[in-house]
Amino acid sequence: MSVFERFTEPADRVMELAWEEAERLRHDYLGPEHVLAGLARQEDSHAAAILRSSGLDTQAVRAGLDRLVAQGMLPARWRNKSDLLSSLGIDLDAVQRAIAESFGTDAVCAAHKRVLRRPSRREDLLIGTNPLNGKAMLAKRAFHLAGKEPDGLGQHDIDPEHLLLGVLRDALAPVSSSWRSRRLKRIRTYLGLPGHGPSPVRLMIEATGMGLEALMDEVLAELHATT
Protein backbone atom coordinates (compact mmCIF):
# COMPACT_ATOMS: atom_id res chain seq x y z
CA MET A 1 0.00 0.00 0.00
CA SER A 2 1.36 3.42 -0.96
CA VAL A 3 1.76 6.31 1.47
CA PHE A 4 -1.01 8.21 -0.30
CA GLU A 5 -3.52 5.40 0.18
CA ARG A 6 -3.05 5.77 3.94
CA PHE A 7 -4.11 9.42 3.99
CA THR A 8 -7.20 10.11 6.07
CA GLU A 9 -9.94 12.37 4.74
CA PRO A 10 -8.49 15.42 6.57
CA ALA A 11 -5.06 14.66 5.07
CA ASP A 12 -6.62 14.42 1.60
CA ARG A 13 -8.22 17.80 2.24
CA VAL A 14 -4.81 19.23 3.13
CA MET A 15 -3.57 18.03 -0.26
CA GLU A 16 -6.45 19.77 -2.04
CA LEU A 17 -5.72 23.00 -0.18
CA ALA A 18 -1.99 22.69 -0.88
CA TRP A 19 -2.63 22.45 -4.62
CA GLU A 20 -4.86 25.53 -4.34
CA GLU A 21 -1.99 27.41 -2.70
CA ALA A 22 0.40 26.35 -5.46
CA GLU A 23 -2.12 27.58 -8.02
CA ARG A 24 -2.54 30.87 -6.15
CA LEU A 25 1.18 31.47 -6.65
CA ARG A 26 1.02 30.14 -10.23
CA HIS A 27 3.67 27.56 -9.35
CA ASP A 28 4.03 24.60 -11.69
CA TYR A 29 4.78 22.16 -8.86
CA LEU A 30 3.69 21.15 -5.36
CA GLY A 31 6.38 21.73 -2.74
CA PRO A 32 6.52 21.26 1.04
CA GLU A 33 5.92 25.00 1.39
CA HIS A 34 2.53 24.63 -0.31
CA VAL A 35 1.69 21.68 1.95
CA LEU A 36 2.51 23.87 4.97
CA ALA A 37 0.00 26.41 3.67
CA GLY A 38 -2.56 23.64 3.18
CA LEU A 39 -2.00 22.46 6.75
CA ALA A 40 -2.57 25.99 8.05
CA ARG A 41 -5.83 26.24 6.09
CA GLN A 42 -7.18 22.91 7.44
CA GLU A 43 -8.21 24.84 10.54
CA ASP A 44 -9.98 22.09 12.51
CA SER A 45 -6.88 19.88 12.83
CA HIS A 46 -4.36 19.68 15.67
CA ALA A 47 -1.66 20.50 13.09
CA ALA A 48 -3.31 23.83 12.25
CA ALA A 49 -3.72 24.63 15.96
CA ILE A 50 0.00 24.02 16.53
CA LEU A 51 0.89 26.24 13.57
CA ARG A 52 -1.42 29.02 14.81
CA SER A 53 0.13 28.90 18.28
CA SER A 54 3.52 29.33 16.61
CA GLY A 55 2.41 32.37 14.63
CA LEU A 56 1.81 30.46 11.40
CA ASP A 57 -1.86 30.87 10.57
CA THR A 58 -3.01 30.99 6.94
CA GLN A 59 -2.34 34.71 6.58
CA ALA A 60 1.18 34.42 8.03
CA VAL A 61 2.11 31.42 5.87
CA ARG A 62 0.85 33.15 2.74
CA ALA A 63 2.78 36.28 3.65
CA GLY A 64 5.88 34.13 4.12
CA LEU A 65 5.40 32.51 0.71
CA ASP A 66 4.93 35.89 -0.96
CA ARG A 67 8.05 37.20 0.77
CA LEU A 68 10.13 34.25 -0.48
CA VAL A 69 8.83 34.86 -4.00
CA ALA A 70 9.89 38.51 -3.75
CA GLN A 71 13.33 37.43 -2.48
CA GLY A 72 13.81 34.97 -5.34
CA MET A 73 13.78 31.92 -3.06
CA LEU A 74 10.59 30.72 -4.76
CA PRO A 75 9.57 31.19 -8.40
CA ALA A 76 7.65 34.27 -9.47
CA ARG A 77 4.25 33.78 -11.03
CA TRP A 78 4.80 32.55 -14.55
CA ARG A 79 3.06 31.25 -17.64
CA ASN A 80 2.88 27.54 -16.94
CA LYS A 81 1.32 24.67 -18.87
CA SER A 82 -2.13 25.64 -17.61
CA ASP A 83 -1.65 29.14 -19.03
CA LEU A 84 -0.55 27.69 -22.38
CA LEU A 85 -3.68 25.53 -22.54
CA SER A 86 -5.80 28.57 -21.62
CA SER A 87 -4.32 30.47 -24.57
CA LEU A 88 -5.63 27.63 -26.75
CA GLY A 89 -9.10 27.91 -25.23
CA ILE A 90 -8.71 24.95 -22.85
CA ASP A 91 -9.58 25.55 -19.18
CA LEU A 92 -7.61 22.87 -17.30
CA ASP A 93 -9.44 23.59 -14.03
CA ALA A 94 -12.77 23.12 -15.81
CA VAL A 95 -11.54 19.83 -17.26
CA GLN A 96 -10.55 18.61 -13.79
CA ARG A 97 -13.93 19.66 -12.36
CA ALA A 98 -15.73 17.85 -15.18
CA ILE A 99 -13.75 14.68 -14.46
CA ALA A 100 -14.65 14.90 -10.77
CA GLU A 101 -18.33 15.53 -11.60
CA SER A 102 -18.44 12.59 -14.00
CA PHE A 103 -16.64 10.01 -11.89
CA GLY A 104 -16.94 11.46 -8.38
CA THR A 105 -14.30 13.09 -6.18
CA ASP A 106 -13.60 9.84 -4.33
CA ALA A 107 -12.91 7.99 -7.58
CA VAL A 108 -10.56 10.73 -8.77
CA CYS A 109 -8.67 10.69 -5.45
CA ALA A 110 -8.42 6.90 -5.59
CA ALA A 111 -7.03 7.01 -9.14
CA HIS A 112 -4.57 9.70 -8.09
CA LYS A 113 -3.30 7.54 -5.23
CA ARG A 114 -2.90 4.47 -7.45
CA VAL A 115 -0.71 6.40 -9.87
CA LEU A 116 1.40 7.70 -6.99
CA ARG A 117 2.48 4.27 -5.76
CA ARG A 118 6.08 4.16 -4.57
CA PRO A 119 8.46 3.84 -7.55
CA SER A 120 11.70 1.88 -7.65
CA ARG A 121 14.21 4.62 -8.38
CA ARG A 122 15.61 6.30 -5.29
CA GLU A 123 15.45 9.81 -6.76
CA ASP A 124 11.78 9.25 -7.57
CA LEU A 125 11.15 9.20 -3.82
CA LEU A 126 11.88 12.93 -4.02
CA ILE A 127 9.66 13.77 -6.95
CA GLY A 128 6.54 12.50 -8.65
CA THR A 129 3.92 13.85 -11.06
CA ASN A 130 0.28 14.62 -10.41
CA PRO A 131 -1.59 12.59 -13.07
CA LEU A 132 -4.47 15.07 -13.13
CA ASN A 133 -2.47 18.16 -14.06
CA GLY A 134 1.03 16.92 -14.97
CA LYS A 135 2.70 19.10 -12.34
CA ALA A 136 5.78 18.03 -10.40
CA MET A 137 5.35 16.72 -6.85
CA LEU A 138 8.44 18.08 -5.09
CA ALA A 139 6.85 17.35 -1.70
CA LYS A 140 7.03 13.60 -2.22
CA ARG A 141 9.96 13.08 0.17
CA ALA A 142 8.01 14.90 2.89
CA PHE A 143 5.07 12.54 2.30
CA HIS A 144 7.27 9.46 2.70
CA LEU A 145 8.77 10.90 5.89
CA ALA A 146 5.21 11.51 7.10
CA GLY A 147 4.43 7.85 6.47
CA LYS A 148 7.17 6.77 8.85
CA GLU A 149 5.65 8.64 11.79
CA PRO A 150 2.53 6.50 12.37
CA ASP A 151 4.63 3.37 11.79
CA GLY A 152 6.81 4.33 14.75
CA LEU A 153 3.73 4.89 16.91
CA GLY A 154 2.06 1.62 15.94
CA GLN A 155 -0.51 3.42 13.80
CA HIS A 156 -1.56 3.05 10.16
CA ASP A 157 -3.41 6.15 8.99
CA ILE A 158 -1.64 9.36 8.03
CA ASP A 159 -3.29 12.44 9.54
CA PRO A 160 -2.47 16.15 9.07
CA GLU A 161 -0.20 15.99 12.13
CA HIS A 162 1.92 13.30 10.46
CA LEU A 163 2.04 15.40 7.31
CA LEU A 164 3.24 18.39 9.32
CA LEU A 165 5.98 16.33 10.92
CA GLY A 166 7.03 15.00 7.51
CA VAL A 167 7.22 18.54 6.12
CA LEU A 168 9.32 19.64 9.11
CA ARG A 169 11.68 16.66 8.88
CA ASP A 170 12.13 17.33 5.17
CA ALA A 171 13.01 20.95 5.99
CA LEU A 172 15.89 19.91 8.27
CA ALA A 173 18.16 19.25 5.29
CA PRO A 174 19.42 22.06 3.04
CA VAL A 175 18.09 21.98 -0.51
CA SER A 176 21.40 20.89 -2.05
CA SER A 177 21.62 17.70 0.05
CA SER A 178 18.34 16.34 -1.33
CA TRP A 179 18.76 17.32 -4.98
CA ARG A 180 22.16 16.01 -6.05
CA SER A 181 21.41 14.15 -9.28
CA ARG A 182 21.64 16.01 -12.60
CA ARG A 183 18.05 15.13 -13.43
CA LEU A 184 16.68 16.62 -10.22
CA LYS A 185 18.86 19.71 -10.57
CA ARG A 186 17.52 20.24 -14.10
CA ILE A 187 13.96 19.98 -12.79
CA ARG A 188 14.61 22.61 -10.12
CA THR A 189 16.24 24.90 -12.68
CA TYR A 190 13.30 24.47 -15.05
CA LEU A 191 10.87 25.35 -12.26
CA GLY A 192 12.87 28.44 -11.31
CA LEU A 193 13.96 27.10 -7.92
CA PRO A 194 17.41 27.68 -6.39
CA GLY A 195 19.63 24.61 -6.08
CA HIS A 196 21.06 25.49 -2.69
CA GLY A 197 20.24 27.21 0.58
CA PRO A 198 17.83 26.44 3.43
CA SER A 199 14.42 24.91 2.82
CA PRO A 200 11.67 27.50 2.22
CA VAL A 201 9.74 25.85 5.07
CA ARG A 202 12.64 26.43 7.47
CA LEU A 203 12.89 30.06 6.36
CA MET A 204 9.17 30.66 6.95
CA ILE A 205 9.21 29.06 10.38
CA GLU A 206 12.34 30.83 11.57
CA ALA A 207 10.94 34.17 10.38
CA THR A 208 8.37 33.86 13.19
CA GLY A 209 11.13 33.45 15.78
CA MET A 210 10.30 29.76 16.24
CA GLY A 211 12.99 27.13 15.78
CA LEU A 212 12.32 24.26 13.38
CA GLU A 213 13.43 21.64 15.91
CA ALA A 214 11.30 23.20 18.66
CA LEU A 215 8.24 23.05 16.43
CA MET A 216 8.98 19.40 15.63
CA ASP A 217 9.15 18.62 19.34
CA GLU A 218 5.76 20.26 19.83
CA VAL A 219 4.18 18.18 17.05
CA LEU A 220 5.73 14.97 18.41
CA ALA A 221 4.40 15.75 21.89
CA GLU A 222 0.91 16.23 20.44
CA LEU A 223 1.11 12.93 18.56
CA HIS A 224 2.21 11.01 21.64
CA ALA A 225 -0.48 12.69 23.75
CA THR A 226 -3.22 11.59 21.35
CA THR A 227 -1.92 8.04 20.81
Q: Where would I find each of the regions flagged by the language model?
A:
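Histone-fold recognition with a strong bias for associated Lys/Arg-rich disordered tails
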Residues: 1-227
